[in-house]
Amino acid sequence: MARIAGVNIPENKHTVISLTYIFGIGRTRAESICATTGIEQTAKVRELTGEQLDAIRGEVAKFSTEGDLRREINMNIKRLMDLGCYRGIRHRRGLPLRGQRTKTNARTRKGPRKPIRK
């Protein structure tokens, strides 16, 4: 298994698909990484040479991925909550942020139904 950005990526898949196993790299970014490194997208990871893997590692290192990206996202949410702005309050209460209705629906964000106590 090839290891890129602290993630074991599958060797029997195409390079583009394997790169999407890294948090913060989607299909578009994976395609651009393959284009800049000159690696064919349909090439399997096990067929790549060590130099090509190093080139991919160098390109991936330019982006914020995995733990750094998760930390950055959590810090942004924490900042919103500390500011006390509308989005921060909605995060704190566990409600939808972007104007969705909550009288009905929004079960995913609100969690399972609470029983009514009499």
From Swiss-Prot:
GO terms for cellular component: cytosol; small ribosomal subunit
Keyword Zinc-finger: no
GO biological process: translation
Gene3D superfamilies for the chain: 1.10.8.50, 30s ribosomal protein s13, domain 2
Keywords: Ribonucleoprotein, Ribosomal protein, RNA-binding, rRNA-binding, tRNA-binding
Domain of life per record: Bacteria
Matches recorded under Pfam families: Ribosomal_S13 (PF00416)
Disordered, as annotated region: 94-118
Disulfide bonds: none
MF annotations from Gene Ontology: rRNA binding; structural constituent of ribosome; tRNA binding
PANTHER family for the chain: 30S RIBOSOMAL PROTEIN S13/40S RIBOSOMAL PROTEIN S18 (PTHR10871), SMALL RIBOSOMAL SUBUNIT PROTEIN US13M (PTHR10871:SF1)
Subunit (UniProt): Part of the 30S ribosomal subunit. Forms a loose heterodimer with protein S19. Forms two bridges to the 50S subunit in the 70S ribosome.
UniProt function note: Located at the top of the head of the 30S subunit, it contacts several helices of the 16S rRNA. In the 70S ribosome it contacts the 23S rRNA (bridge B1a) and protein L5 of the 50S subunit (bridge B1b), connecting the 2 subunits; these bridges are implicated in subunit movement. Contacts the tRNAs in the A and P-sites.
Record family assignment: Belongs to the universal ribosomal protein uS13 family.
Entry protein name: Small ribosomal subunit protein uS13
